Amino acid sequence: MSNQEQTFIAVKPDGVQRGLVGNIISRFENRGFKLVAMKLTQPGQAHLEKHYEDLNTKPFFAGLIKYMNSGPICAMVWEGKDAVKTGRTILGATNPLASAPGTIRGDFALDMGRNVCHGSDSVENAKKEIALWFKPEELNQWNHHSAAWIFE
């Protein structure tokens, strides 16, 4: 299978509190992606500041960190063909009001500050985010037997 890659997807505290984790997992599984790592975690302020370090000069940074630190986060690594690009498509636009119906944000979110989930925006950032949130031994390598029925 060409363009096999991994992406980091996180269900943010609002998504966890609203009971959307299972639905979000289903969206990725139904599309044909393979879940290789998952944990429910409250990583703390320092970890979140590192994750969002590219936004640290933005006026909303402190509020973002406070919100992300307000409850558990479901951190996941998904693997498959064009996982980063397709994962972002499944999530929808960062601003839920600009997200198409049928996307996670288009179906479950209304406010940019409570947009339910995070997804890596590039292959390079996916690698960095996966390394920040997971140890190498937490990434499971297993055979996705339905892959033959999903990919040529």
From Swiss-Prot:
PROSITE patterns assigned to the protein according to its UniProt record, in alphabetical order: NDPK, NDPK_LIKE
Recall the GO molecular function terms of this protein's record. ATP binding; metal ion binding; nucleoside diphosphate kinase activity
Catalytic activity reads:
a 2'-deoxyribonucleoside 5'-diphosphate + ATP = a 2'-deoxyribonucleoside 5'-triphosphate + ADP; a ribonucleoside 5'-diphosphate + ATP = a ribonucleoside 5'-triphosphate + ADP
Listed cofactors? Mg(2+)
Keyword ATP-binding belongs to the record: yes
User: What is a biological process (GO) this protein takes part in?
Assistant: UTP biosynthetic process
This chain's function reads:
Major role in the synthesis of nucleoside triphosphates other than ATP. The ATP gamma phosphate is transferred to the NDP beta phosphate via a ping-pong mechanism, using a phosphorylated active-site intermediate.
Q: Which NCBIfam families match?
A: PRK00668.1 (NF001908)
Q: How does it assemble?
A: Homotrimer.
Annotated protein name in UniProt: Nucleoside diphosphate kinase
Q: What is the lineage of its organism?
A: Eukaryota, Fungi, Dikarya, Ascomycota, Pezizomycotina
Q: Tell me the name of the encoding gene.
A: ndk-1
